[in-house]
Every structure is written in C-alpha cells, then in structure tokens.
Amino acid sequence: MEESETVLKLRRQLKEAEEERVKAAHYGLELLESQSDLQNQLEEQRNEMTGTIENLEQEKYSLQREVELKNRMLESLTSECENIRQQQKLSLEQLEEQLERNHHRELSEIKDKLEKLKAELDEARLSEKQLKHKLDYQTEVLANKSEELRMMSERVHETMSSEMLTLQLEKTELETAKDNLEQELNELQYREQQLLLTNGNQSRQLERLQTEKEEREKEAVGYFSALEKAREANQDLQAQLDIALQQAQDPNSKGNSLFAEVEDRRSEMERQLISMKVQFQSLQKQHAFSRQQMHRMKIQIATLLQLKGSHSDPEQLERLQAMVAQKNSEIETLVMKVRQLEKSQQICENGPVASSCDGLGQGDETYYVDLLKMKLVNSSKEIDKVKDELSLQRMKALAESQRVLELERKLFTNDRHLKLSQGENMKLRVNLDEMKMKYEPDEMGKIRTQKRRKEQLPLDCLIDNTSVAVTSGTEAHGVSDATPGETCTAESSDDKKLPKEDLSLSTKDQDPSSVLLKPNEPPNGQPPKERKRVRIMEDEKDTPDLNKRNPNNCTITSIHPRSTYEESTSELKKVDEEQEKRKQERKSRLRAPPVLHVPSKPATAQCPQQ
C-alpha cells in the first residue's frame, strides 16, 4: 500500500510537472510570438525612422545647397562690389595722381615764373643801382666840369702864357680820358655783376631742371613698369580669349554640359552618401541596443547557471529514490526466493529418501527406472551449476551497478562544477566586456570581427547525461533482477565469460563514458557470436509473484538500453571530441600569448587563465 501510494504520489507530481512544462512551453511560445511581433514592429519603426531621417537629411542637404548657392551669389555680389570699389579706388588714385601732376606742373611753372620775375627784379634793381651810381658820377663829373669851366673862364680873363694853355688843355684831355676809362670800368663792373646775377639764376634754374628731370625719369620708370604689367595682363587675357575661342569653335568639346553632368553626378553621390550615413547610424544604434540586450542576457544566464549549479537536481533525487525503492523490493523478492528454495531443497531431500525406502521394499526394479534416476541426478547437478553461475553473474552485475552509480555520482558532481565554472566564466566575460566597453570602446569592433564559433548554451547536457545514466542503471538493474524463472538473452551469456581482469583493464584504459556505453562488448573488439539460450522453468505459483514484483523482463531491459546506448554513443563521442579539442586549445594557449575572446563552450580549465 505504501508503495502504491508513493507511486501514485510520484505519478501525480509527474503529471503536475508535465502540466507545468506544457504551460511553460505555451507561455514560452506566446513570449516568442510576442517577441517576434515586437521585433517586426521595431523593424518597421526603424525602417520608418530611417526613411524619415533620410528624407530630413535630403531636405537638409537641399537646404544646405540652397544656402551654399545663396552664399555663392552673395560672395559673387560682394566680389563684384569689391571690384567696383577697387576700380573706383583705382580711378580715384589715378585722378589724384593726375591732379598732383597738374598741380606739380603748375607749381613748377609758377616757380619758373617766380624765378624769372626774381631775376628780372634783381636785374632791375642792379640796373637801377648802376644808373644811380652813374647818375651820381655824372653829376659829380658835371660839377667838376662846371667848376673847371668856371675856373677856366676866370683864368681866360687873366693873362696866361701859351705853354700853360697847352698844358692845361692836355690836362683836361687826360682827365676826360681818365673819366672815360673810369666810366668804361664801371660799365664793365656793372656788366660783370649782371653776368654773375644771370649765372646764379641760370644755376638755380639748372638745379630745378635737374630735379624735375629726376622726377620725370621716376615717373617714366613707373609708367614703363605699369605699361609692362598692362602688356602682360593683356597677353594673358588674349591667350585666354584665344583658348575660349578655340573651345567654342571645337565641336568635340562639351563645354558647360560636361560641368553640369559632373555637378549632377556629384550631387547624386552626395545624396547616396547621406542615405548611407543615415542607414549606418541606424544600424549602429541597433547594434548597440542588441549588444546591451546580449549583455543583459549573459548576466541572466550566468545567474541562472550559478543557481542551477548550487541547487540539486530534483530528477536525480527522484531517480535515486526510485532506485532505493527498487533495491528494497529486490531484496524482499530475493528473501522470498531464498525461503522458497530452502523449502524446495528440503522437499527434494525428503523425496529421494522415501523413494529409496520404497525401492528397498519393492525389491528389483527395471533398468528404465535407474536410468531415469541417473538423468534426474545429472539434471539436478546441472541446475546447481547454473545456479552458481547465475549467482556469480548477479554479483558481477551488482558490482557493475555499483560502479555505474559511482560514475554517475562523479558525473553529476562534475556537471555541477562545470555549471558553476560556466557561470563564473560568464560573469568574468561580462565584466571583461563591461571593462572593454568602458575603457576601450573603439577596440570592441575589431575584436568582434574575429572568426569564432557560434555560442551554445549548455542547458541540454544535464538531460543527455541523466538519460544515459538512467539507461545504464536500468540495464544494471535488469541484469540483477534476472531469476531462474526469467528469460536470459545472448548478451547475458556473454557476460558470464568475461573475466574480472579484462573488466578492470578495460575500465582503466577507457573513459567512464566508454564503460557505460560498452558493457557487453568483449575485450578483443569482435562482435559476440550467437549462443544457445538456456530456459529454466519453475512452478507457476512463483512466477506471477515475481512478475508482479518485477514486471520488467530481462529481454525488455536488454533490448531497450541497446537503443538508448546507440543514441548516447554519438553524444558521448561528441563530448570526447570536444574534450580533446579543449585540451589542444589549452596547450596552444599555454604556448601562444593569451587572447581574451568569447569561446563557444568554455571549459573549466580556462577559468583560472582568464
């Protein structure tokens, strides 16, 4: 009754767990559908946003082009205004220079006139002075002559000799000659003064003319340089004019259409560049958002892995409880069988004694009865041998089941440590990503571009391991539950001939996974041959009780694990290959400098290195 209640309770719990799993799957599907809908809506919104941003960028670009055109027009107008201003300034400077030249020329003419007037004034003053001096001299001479004439007239009246008269006449003549000579001397002096005055005037005029000449030479040099510049500019303009005329006359040249085509292409390429920039910015934002979501998911996965590693597996506990209950039931069945065998042995011992007594009483029997007795004795001996072999096989099966349980225990402890290490590794990777995003945001894109395998979450490993362990456990229990009234297959007969040394060597050389997968394979690797099957029949009274207590037959337990072994072999081979790859990667990392990246399935040995 207690066993039935526990079975009902376990079935009820199993049913509730199945219902919860169905609900969780339903809710998960709903969440996936809602997430896909939200993802589609987000994609549509992103497309709309990129379209609007692209349109706004195109409008911005067109407005910028208009502003640039207006700025160019304004610059052209300002340049024209500046050119006009420069032209006006140049014309004003030319006018000023011309006025200065005219003023300078008029000033020079006035200076010339002034110099001439000064020279004439000096000459007039000199002539006036000379005339005054001459007048004074003439008046003095006249006064002297009048005095002499008066004296002569007075002396005329006096008597004088002729010699005296001649001498006086000579004297007068000499005096007149002297006066004439003095007059000539004065005239020459006057002439000399006039010549000196004219010489000074001429020297001053010469100096003025030299200065004018130098100024005119400077003006001529400036005019010549300006003329040369004008000639060069004229030549350049003439060359440009000739080139423009040749291009206009050339039919192959496209002229302004080529520039217009180039401008159109440039504007089109700029529009495409703007659209690509907008799309790149939107994709960059989407990448940042997805990276944040991946970061959060990694944190959640790390916490879940740590929680799952810290908690014990309820399926494992239930399975162990079921195994304990099954073992208890097996012990009870074995005790009942021992009692039944003792009773049957006592009956068999009493049977031959009674038959021997009857034989002595009856006397001589036929030869046929003796033959049957001999056959019965031989069959009983064979039955004893088979029972001994069966007990030995049971002990081997119990040892194998104990070994399987120990290996399962080690496997589950390793799985728990693996999950804990995976959680710690995930946390370390999350912290590493945070530090890289904080201190080296530009290096994240370079690291992301490295080739790496797709990361898979190790959530199904526990299910595979538990299925493999359950199948191995059921096989071991099936072998241990074999009784003389049950059917045994060829695999059970092959296990009888395996020595203990071969089993120990095979378990030492092979991994636990190979021990679990290949319990029936001989050590030489050859497939087992078909052997004869031995079927031992017992009373019908004992068989239904055994079938009730242990409904699983040996054939069922031997056939079902075979299929599960074949399924689990591929999985465990993959696990072995992954372990070898991890060992090779660890050796290469020990040789090469360490590179921090996110692997697909982190191993426990990589945690201390990172």
From Swiss-Prot:
Domain of life: Eukaryota
UniProt keyword annotation of Coiled coil present: yes
GO cellular component terms, A-Z: nucleus; outer kinetochore; spindle pole
GO MF annotation: an example: kinetochore binding
Localization: Chromosome, Centromere, Kinetochore
Primary localisation category: nucleus
Coiled-coil positions: 1-392
Stretch list, region Disordered: 474-610
Basic and acidic residues composition-biased segments: 493-511, 535-548, 570-583
Single GO BP term: mitotic spindle assembly checkpoint signaling
Protein family according to the UniProt entry: Belongs to the Spindly family.
HAMAP family named in the record: SPDLY
Function description: Required for the localization of dynein and dynactin to the mitotic kintochore. Dynein is believed to control the initial lateral interaction between the kinetochore and spindle microtubules and to facilitate the subsequent formation of end-on kinetochore-microtubule attachments mediated by the NDC80 complex.
Protein name: Protein Spindly-B
Originating organism: Xenopus laevis (African clawed frog)
Lineage of the species this protein comes from: Eukaryota, Metazoa, Chordata, Craniata, Vertebrata
Encoding gene per record: spdl1-b
